[in-house]
Amino acid sequence: MASLPSYAQKLSLSTNLLDYACLGTMNADVSYSVSRRWSVMAGVRYNPFTFNEDDPQEQFQMRQQSYAVGARLWPWHTMSGWWFAGKLRYQEYNHGGILSPESEEGDRFGAGLYAGYTYMLTSHLNLEFGTGFWSGVSLYRTYSCPKCGKTIDHGRKYFLLPDDLMISLAYVF
């Protein structure tokens, strides 16, 4: 008696809807199921926007490009239910003028831990909820305002930041 290989949904493409509220940060994640309980992922975030450029006193931005790779552990099975994740991440950033007149730019390298829940809406559409934090080192330069260019500090510092507050829409292939 011959058996046919079973079909399983192994690939998903998702976007975090809450990232768009962060001054228009575009984002995408690709996940691939490597076993019943493990998936690997790669993600990117990009925000090129600067607001009120014509008025240095009112200018603000949350510009970034960020790249991450990681893995998720699914206690039940991939692409549905609770999950726990770890990621390695690189971020080039420039933010300022939001909470204070200062602006900071630099590069961050780090790792993060995350947890969440994935709810199946249909056989191909999932809704993901999750949160986490990441920590690492930042090579930075701080300016007195977003546009003036006067350096007030620079160097290396360690950070621990909240990350990936997410409500994501995922399409499962």
What is each model feature region?
Residues 32-129, 168-171:
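Gram-negative (and chloroplast) outer-membrane scaffold detector with strong preference
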Residues 19, 31-34, 159:
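Short secondary-structure boundary/capping segments within folded domains
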Residues 122-173:
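Predominantly the C-terminal beta-signal and adjacent terminal strand-loop region
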Residues 22, 48-51, 136-137:
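A short local loop/turn or secondary-structure capping micro-motif enriched for an aromatic residue
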Residues 1-10, 173:
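Cleavable N-terminal export/targeting peptides
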Residues 10-13, 52-54, 96-99, 148-154:
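Extracytoplasmic loops and strand-loop junctions of Gram-negative outer membrane beta-barrel proteins
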Residues 14-29, 47, 78:
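Solvent-exposed loop/turn segments connecting transmembrane beta-strands
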Residues 20-22, 54-62, 148-158:
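Surface-exposed strand-loop-strand hairpins of Gram-negative outer-membrane beta-barrel proteins
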